[in-house]
């Protein structure tokens, strides 16, 4: 998603598309409004291995793979961010939650790294570079936001004849249903709810 970076104090933009995006510290993105917004880029190889390569089969294997990612950090105070769906742990991969707990314990006892959260990282490791992000884009799809509306080729299995052509008509049906519901809320909601739109937003 990040396509270019440059130092905060100015200079030329550097192309970081592909696998060259710096992932060891946050990046600052300037929104169209002029307000700054910080982004964190997850460690691609480590995150993919957690999802697909079986490293969550044991805490030791997860920690060994994470150690390799940590060794690649260009500065001692940098971070490594593993991004994964929460349902990976115990749903997609049975026992992965136990492996994660074991890896976190081993990490703490060995002093290899400190487990933290992104707010603390941003506080202690401020951005030194600003970034430009491809638009539109989604972290879970290499084709922009196509996986939510069309046959973008992202799929669970690569069986012959399988595709996602159903996405466009499904999206159209959901949008049509949304518009119909909005129409009904506008027509009948005032007599039932003090503020129908606020109720919808707070639902």
State what each model feature region is.
Residues 13-47, 55-203:
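Active-site and substrate-binding clefts of carbohydrate-active enzymes
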């Amino acid at each position: 998603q990040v396509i270019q970076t440059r130092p905060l104090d100015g200079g030329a933009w550097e192309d970081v598309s592909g696998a060259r995006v710096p992932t060891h510290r946050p990046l600052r993105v300037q929104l169209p409004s002029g307000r700054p917004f910080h982004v964190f880029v997850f460690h691609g190889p480590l995150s993919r291995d957690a999802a697909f390569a079986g490293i969550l089969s044991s805490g030791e294997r997860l920690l060994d793979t994470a150690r390799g990612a940590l060794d690649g950090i260009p500065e001692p105070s940098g971070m490594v961010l593993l991004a994964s769906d929460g349902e990976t742990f115990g749903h997609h991969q049975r026992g992965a939650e136990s492996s994660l707990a074991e890896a976190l314990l081993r990490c703490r006892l060995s002093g290899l790294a400190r487990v933290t959260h992104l707010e603390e990282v941003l506080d202690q490791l401020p951005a030194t570079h600003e970034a430009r992000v491809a638009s539109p884009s989604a972290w879970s799809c290499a084709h922009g936001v196509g996986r939510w509306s069309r046959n973008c080729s992202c799929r669970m299995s690569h069986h012959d004849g399988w595709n996602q052509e159903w996405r466009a008509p499904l999206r159209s049906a959901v949008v049509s249903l949304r518009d119909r519901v909005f129409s009904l809320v506008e027509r009948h909601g005032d007599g039932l709810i003090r503020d129908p739109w606020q109720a919808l937003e707070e639902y």
